[in-house]
Swiss-Prot record:
Entry GO terms, CC: endoplasmic reticulum lumen; extracellular region
GO MF annotations, alphabetized: cytokinin dehydrogenase activity; FAD binding; primary methylamine oxidase activity
Regions that span the bilayer: none
Co-factor requirement: FAD
Gene name of this polypeptide: CKX2
Originating organism: Arabidopsis thaliana (Mouse-ear cress)
Glycosylation sites (chain numbering): 32, 51, 107
Lineage, highest ranks first: Eukaryota, Viridiplantae, Streptophyta, Embryophyta, Tracheophyta
Compartments, record wording: Endoplasmic reticulum; Secreted, Extracellular space
Name of the protein in question: Cytokinin dehydrogenase 2
Length: 501
């Protein structure tokens, strides 16, 4: 009889969940959390945008509040049944960084909210909110964030845990540089508010901290006036030095007479050349140009505005059309709504989805390269590796940004060099499962070339598998990074998919 009472007590106290892969996680009923082991939910949480890895969690929770996450982490840190936890937004990682084998995935998209302050200078945003929804909500009040990633259908928390880069970085810095305050739940389950003045060690740690010190649940994002429209240009170059010289000149110009967005793209003759931005009458000319030269460089810029009749708009257009050294005749301009410009990649996503090409593996390689070595990088990587690849599929981005827009106190890394300008490189290739090893081999060859040539690159959205590589990556920040882990997540529960600790 005593044994029966004990069994009943145990059943009452514990909610025992066993996933389809045989991994068991015990959560006390008092936590009032529902751990889903539905096969479809587990399957979705086992994969990410990279479509390269499969890592199966023990279960997934959809929190109704930040308190749910706090209770989960307190139990994981202090309970008898220790398990690891990973926060996951849209799963836009490339190599399982937001995964946890046998542990618990916290579906951050279950917590969304955008509240604009009365003075419209900032918005308090729940970490599971998509950037596109932040844009929609803030634009209703005539304001918007000042820096953006190219793709807006990703979560605020996930982006800030990595850095957040795009074509506005040269002007306003990465997304992590435009945060005033955060709410974070540490690996001990503590719910803390942090900023540059309050708990700064946590604030600087989690921005670009790869989820190692806590789960961001709220971010206070800087806002400014939301322009109505954008004049969007693309210009073609056949000479790399001329191309980069014009890029660097544009990012050095003052705000009022300069552009608001700048990126660069590389067209390769062994890849797919998207000529759709240009008028139909010019598209065959663009394609022929790429065939003729092998490599063509695309300067892409935008100027935001409200009133097209303002003199400054004409002045900027004159600067672009009359003083830059692009190939004569190879310039195209679109006039689009501000929202449509920022959401442009989603349009391309829908096209790829309709063709069944979105769910392919994405062996992307993202790098920061010092300005002083960008020509060496171009010659050794673009000419001698990418152009000689059997076929290139996807985008190759290359554009400069100003180093002073980054805050070195944050975990986010860029090359530790004494230079004012660094280049952002995005080799955004896709591959069939059959071709994946070839593309991964190309990426390895690129990294090896940079190391052998002494080019002090830093990777972005990286995935290392050895502690030595992580120590090298964080460089002078490693000691602080390691100490912060011991301080805020001493049991190493958070974001194990990064393979750091």
């Amino acid at each position: 009889m005593a044994n029966l009472r004990l069994m009943i007590t145990l059943i009452t106290v514990l909610m025992i969940t066993k996933s389809s892969n045989g991994i068991k996680i015990d959560l006390p009923k008092s936590l009032n959390l529902t751990l889903s082991t539905d096969p479809s939910i587990i399957s979705a949480a086992s994969h990410d945008f990279g479509n390269i890895t499969t890592v199966t969690p023990g279960g997934v929770i959809c929190p109704s509040s930040t308190a749910d996450i706090s209770r989960l982490l307190q139990y994981a840190a202090n309970g008898k049944s220790t398990f690891q936890v990973a926060a996951r937004g849209q799963g836009h990682s490339l190599n399982g960084q937001a995964s946890v084998s046998g542990g618990v995935i916290v579906n951050m998209t279950c917590i969304t909210d955008v509240v604009v302050s009365k003075d419209k200078k900032y918005a308090d945003v729940a970490a599971g909110t998509l950037w596109v929804d932040v844009l929609k909500k803030t634009a209703e009040k005539g304001v918007s964030p000042v820096s953006w990633t190219d793709y807006l259908h990703i979560t605020v928390g996930g982006t800030l845990s990595n850095g957040g880069i795009g074509g506005q970085v040269f002007r306003n810095g990465p997304l992590v540089s435009n945060v005033l305050e955060l709410d974070v739940i540490t690996g001990k389950g503590e719910m803390l508010t942090c900023s540059r003045q309050l708990n700064p060690e946590l604030f600087y740690g989690v921005l670009g901290g790869l989820g190692q010190f806590g789960i961001i649940t709220r971010a206070r994002i800087v806002l400014d006036h939301a322009p109505k429209r954008a004049k969007w240009f693309r210009m073609l170059y056949s000479d790399f030095t001329t191309f980069t010289k014009d890029q660097e000149r544009l990012i050095s110009m003052a705000n009022d007479i300069g552009v608001d967005y700048l990126e660069g793209q590389i067209f390769l003759s062994n890849g797919v050349v998207d000529t759709s931005f240009f008028p139909p009458s010019d598209q065959s000319k663009v394609a022929d140009l790429v065939k003729q030269h092998g490599i063509i460089y695309v300067l892409e810029v935008a100027k935001y505005y409200d009133d097209p009749n303002l003199p400054i708009i004409s002045k900027v257009i004159d600067t672009l059309t009359k003083t830059l050294s692009y190939l004569p005749g190879f310039i195209s301009m679109h006039d689009v709504a501000y929202f449509d410009f920022l959401n442009r990649v989603h349009v391309e996503e829908n096209k790829l989805r309709s063709l069944g090409l979105w769910e392919l593996p994405h062996p992307w390689l993202n790098l920061y390269v010092p300005k002083s070595r960008i020509l060496d990088f171009h010659n050794g990587v673009v000419k001698d590796i990418l152009l000689k690849q059997k076929s290139a599929s996807g985008l190759a981005l290359l554009y400069p940004t100003n180093r002073n827009k980054w805050d070195n106190r944050m975990s986010a890394m860029i090359p530790e060099i004494d230079e004012d300008v660094i280049y952002i490189i995005g080799l955004l290739q896709s591959a069939t499962p059959k071709d994946l090893p070839e593309v991964e081999s190309v990426n390895e060859k690129i990294i090896r070339f940079c190391k052998d040539s002494g080019i002090k690159i830093k990777q972005y959205l990286m995935h290392y598998t050895s502690k030595e590589d992580w120590i090298e990556h964080f460089g002078s920040k490693w000691d602080d990074f390691s100490k912060r882990k011991d301080l805020f997540d001493p049991k190493k529960l958070l974001s194990p998919g990064q393979d750091i600790f």
